[in-house]
């Protein structure tokens, strides 16, 4: 603890930081009883102090401070710490650590206004709610450079520690200031910034003064000034905090290498922009709005057109408008000053204020609803004018854009109407977006200003983010804020608890993992993981029809009841509605989801945004321009630039992305935590609510942090660093002169120090210390250093004084000697003998002196020579040193060049990779285009086939028409007069037909235009295909016509003069042909242009591929160069190494010589000392030379050592560079391999593109060929046109002759004019009816077809003409309009149209052939079309000679038309009859309706029965599921089986075959059911035909209606009988179901019994055979059941036929109902059969599984036995091998013995010569015995080898058997899987049956709807019949009157 004098440096802040010395002494002397002083649990205060009075039976009686006596349990009593721990600064040091101790320590310190307290590794601060003098400048200075334990707890201490760690550890730091809203985070953030700006000042001004005289400060001033500006625009009053940050910020302060301030930047997160337009009652909006209205700067009031009353503005007056603790006027001046200091220009400053005022005015804009409309309109323009003025917009444009925004629909913009509420929502969204973008832009500008471009090394990040919030109304913003705090708390927990303990385990420290219960992963995953809240929110935003309700329902479906953190809130009175609750670490929060989808999508009025982009206010235009997004994100904004257009990024997605970036930044730094606490909810200074603080302590992990700090080892240091730093504590513990490991040295060092050895642990790389021990070691080190320095100073001073004393003594002795000698000399100098001595002495020694002088001169010359040599060698060494330095520099330059080359290579690699990515994208695009083209080609092929089918049908129709025309030709002569009278009438009818045709053509063109919008290329192809089809149709028509024209040629010669008027028509047709030719030319040019573009693209791709290949070659060459350079580097390095060794050797030699020279010089000095006084001068010279020589030698040695060390370092550096280069080389090789593989891919893609190119070129050549052929045909047509022009002259003369006939026909024309007009009116009415009721027109045509069939030939002719007219309308429209007076003109027009269509046919074939070139399968069709074109050209030539025959054909047409009119009149009469029929039908329909209602009742009954059946099906499905569970249990048992006998394979295969047979039967049954369904469908179609027959025979139906009713009654009775039968069937099915349930229960019991028996029973192969017999029996049973099913199907068929007979008589609706009943019955029967099959299969599978399990058990036992046998065999084998080895050794010994005996035998033979025959015989007998023994041993050895081989074979057989058993088990596994798959298939069949019943219900509804439509059609037909009857009567009357 520091003394009061030491605390004086803190000034007036000292009492608020640390207890005084007096208080500490009083606390130590205070009486304290450790046993009785306790904390006890209290209901109100959580914990109170108390004194224990007694303890009995687990109960404690205590007296509290308030005097109350309480009795509590033992576990509710907590010991109190001694008084010396009162107000302790680090709570981790307390003896008793628990919640009440921490709480009361914080409370007592807070009562003494000591708001900062350490809690282990982090700092806790409590909000004082008043100003304290603890942030003064003297406090900043006092904390600078202080260690944590040297100064009181403070935010400045945390900041300084982070700063010092940054400098010493060279690591980025971060300070995380966290806590709930209102805890004081913002104030502490400002103090941290103030501290860094003070202690790390740069010392120079960024800008002394701007050119305009604008005020700007230093970097530290600007960093400090950023806070007032951001607070003005980003802070607001909330319920819990008067200055709450409504955005998060991460401030990075960058420092240089020396620790000086370099720059800073700010990243912001999640600005709460909804506060701009809405505030709660107890809150207010952002401070800036109230500052500008404070009237501190009146010029702002005038400039912004506002008042000083906040209630005049709706957006800022919804809550409170004043805050007692904030002076808005002073804050305005601070904000204004901060804007100036931060370097905003004058225009930018004005723009900021203007946009703020515009937001306020936006809230006052009024809108109202137009009368009788929902459209909104402005309610006054005054406010809009102000807002538009401030934003430099046009007021009218702004209002128009708000009320009538333009939205993009497809490729066009349309104006959209807005309701009043929509306009208000749009205005609010624009205001919020404007404010948010302005805020993010300000952050970007601040970052630009704080970026000084100075070099920066490290940074310290300060995080201040919105605290945890629990309001009455919590929305999306609160969820994001709370989620951020959840992530930060998880980061804190992970850093403090998990990582700390994992570090212990990794370092090998004995540590029991402590679960501190702070894992927040569940809540975090609930919010951010897939299918979490954010994921579901973003998914809902993608759906256009999603609502808040659908979002809520999805949340409930996904998480309610599945996650403990997700709850459904309970409705509370007086609170806002809540939709879901989340359990956060700080509490449970209720969230309201209204408007979340719109908030997340963040929609804006794009029309207004467009106005903003064109605004005269540059800042506003920039905010909404496209470039703002990037800058905003660069400025660190949360939502600074949403991605529009290319991607849809929601607010939540952007928020999560920025949050993940923040967490990544934090994880890369060393964090320091500051936990801010709220003492009370009332903002009362000095008061502390226990429960509130305890809740925060628990949630923030404060207690857990203290616990782990005390239990763990928070301080750690590397062994080497510890050894180096703390060796001074006991240097003797580490032996000198020998190597010792740093870890061992640290262990010895700590073991020799007097500390608690339980307070530290040794890890693998570090030594770990408990809290406080490292500080103790630091103190001991400081004391030891002080002792060592003091002792060293004393030793040095003593040595210096002793040296001085010796010098004094030597001087004293010398003085005494001199005095003595002088006195003696003075006494004897006058003696005579002395005088004689003085004269003779020099003469005696002169000769000797001369000799000595000569010797000394020689020595001196030698010394000079040695010195010269030394100087020469030194110079030589210096030159070598210079050369080495030069080589070193060269090497460094080479290394630098290689590094540059590598950097270039990396850049090129990056470029190649980018190019590769681009190529891959292009390849992908081309592939997609090719696929699209193939799809289009396939569609065209299908359409072409369809058109060919239509062509064949049209040909048949034309053949019928030709037959009709031939018949009409016979009657032509009898009806010529009628033709003349009806010619004019026909012309009028033709005009009406033309009108109808035009209308149809207009509809077709509109439809065609829509198709063009969808796909232009496909439309072109479709258009040409349609033209081709129509041309083919016309060609077929004309082919038939030409055959008739040949016969009529002679008759038409008499009517040639009538054709003269056709000349003009021919000319017009020629012009049409020319126009068509031009259009085709343009299309051809367009296609050529597209082909050229495609060709250019292909060439570009080829060029790009060549460039890539070239770049790859360059890279390969560069890599080879690099390899050569590396080899050269190695050679140069080897050379340098060699030179270094040479230099080392030379330097060693020089050193030896210098030492020798030094020795000689020292000897010379000793000799010189003995010289006489007269040689002193010579001696001094020699001494100086010697000293100089020694100095030179020492300098050379030092220089040599330095050079050697430097060269060693250089070599090491070069070695590292070499390793790095080799590593980079390997990386480059890998990259080159990757590039090579990529190039192969690109080359393949290029080859594919080249193939496509060649294909396209072939197609182009074919198209050009076709074009040339078409040009030739056009030339031929032009020649034909010229011939026709010549003939037209003759026709003109004939036309004059026909004029007379025209005058005669005109009178008849006037007679029929009125009739034509009436027909026109009738046709117009019919066309309107056709457009309004398309289905009615179709019905009328169908009725006409029926009438045509009744009247046979007459009606058939009419229908043929109508069909020909409807199919040819689109192409014949032009020549029909030119028909005016006579039939000759029509014939000529047909001729011209034929030519025109021929040319169009050629064009169409051109395109068809282009398509066919892409599709080889259509080649035959192409050839056929070419042949048709050639035939058509021949026909055209023939038609030139057959023009005369056209007259006869025209008369045939006239006759046909006359007959059509006659048939028309007959049709009118028929329609009158049909009217009667319709009346009778209406009567019949009424009766049928009654029957239908009755059938509906029956249907309801059937529905109920169906529902019961569905319930039974669900029960069956559940039983199947239970069976599946049992199967799953069997599977688990089966997985334990490892072996199986191979004999089971045959039985299993037979079982599988039987199952497949069963499946085949099931498939056959399903096929039969499908056939039954198809039969029903066919019968339905027959019923439709029968209904048509009823309409045709309506008269007979009227007569037999009574019988029909009787039949209907009978059918009803039949239906009732069927119903009863079905009820009986249902009862039977219920009985069967119960029986099946019993069987299932029995099967389950059997299964359980079987499982019990499996443990005791072991069956063999006989069981498998019995299982096979059982399978056969089951198969027979299944077959019998299949037969039964077949019988039931037959019964069903019989019932179906009976039902069909009844339906033939009944009406369609009753028929459908009966059909549905039958189908339901069939399906239910099939479901019951399916159920039976499933039960059979389940029982069968269970039986099979029993057999399988039994056999598997047997196999397992046998396998175990085989394994045991194998083990025994292996042991025997090992024994045999040992025996064999032993025998082998014996054999070798025997052989050695034989050799020895042989040797002895030789010796014996020698002895035999001496010893006799007996000895020889004995030896020979012994030899024979030994040989026999050897042979026996060899035999045994051979037998042993045989036995060994036999055992090895046996082991192999067992191994093979084991392998076979394993394979059998695998086969069993596969079989079981197949059986399980079949069970699943049966389940699916049951589900499909249920779906089929639903489909039948849908069919019934559809048929009911068709009945209603049929009734409508009948009504329409009746009305049309009435109209036609009236019209026919009128026409008939007129015709009779005129005749």
Swiss-Prot record:
Gene of this entry: Myh4
Keyword Isomerase: no
Pfam family, one: Myosin_head
Domain description: The rodlike tail sequence is highly repetitive, showing cycles of a 28-residue repeat pattern composed of 4 heptapeptides, characteristic for alpha-helical coiled coils. Limited proteolysis of myosin heavy chain produces 1 light meromyosin (LMM) and 1 heavy meromyosin (HMM). HMM can be further cleaved into 2 globular subfragments (S1) and 1 rod-shaped subfragment (S2).
Subcellular compartments: Cytoplasm, Myofibril
Protein name per Swiss-Prot or TrEMBL: Myosin-4
Family to which the UniProt record says this protein belongs: Belongs to the TRAFAC class myosin-kinesin ATPase superfamily. Myosin family.
UniProt-annotated binding residues for ATP: 179-186
